[in-house]
A protein has these predicted regions:
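N-terminal alpha-helical modules
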Residues: 2, 8-103
Length: 103
């Protein structure tokens, strides 16, 4: 099997660039002029967990004992099997949408 070294270097560079941009956006979301609604925060949470932890690896919490934890679990579970690069891109897109909505 042959690999094109230039293609591999380009992919690594793009991945590093995406990771760096994602990390910047995780900080940027903390500096928004107002707190996003719960629905948007949960969506961002799901993407974030998928990037750093992969597929949801915990059992479903009982909503009766903790609705907040159950909603967070559902948000993460809803992006199960999503590629981490796609999750990073969706996170970045969502933060950009939030920024635009505050203008």
């Amino acid at each position: 099997m042959f690999y094109n070294l230039n293609t591999m270097i380009c992919v690594v560079h793009m991945t590093e660039e995406l990771s760096n941009t994602f990390r910047k956006y995780t900080q940027l979301v903390k500096m928004l002029p107002k707190k996003p609604c719960d629905e948007d925060l949960l969506l961002l949470y799901g993407y974030y967990k998928q990037v750093y932890n992969g597929n949801c690896n915990i059992g479903e919490p009982n909503a009766f004992f903790g609705i907040k934890e159950h909603r967070k679990w559902r948000a993460w579970k809803s992006v199960e099997n999503m590629d981490s690069s796609l999750a990073m891109n969706k996170y970045i897109q969502k933060v950009n949408q939030l920024i635009e909505s505050y203008k």
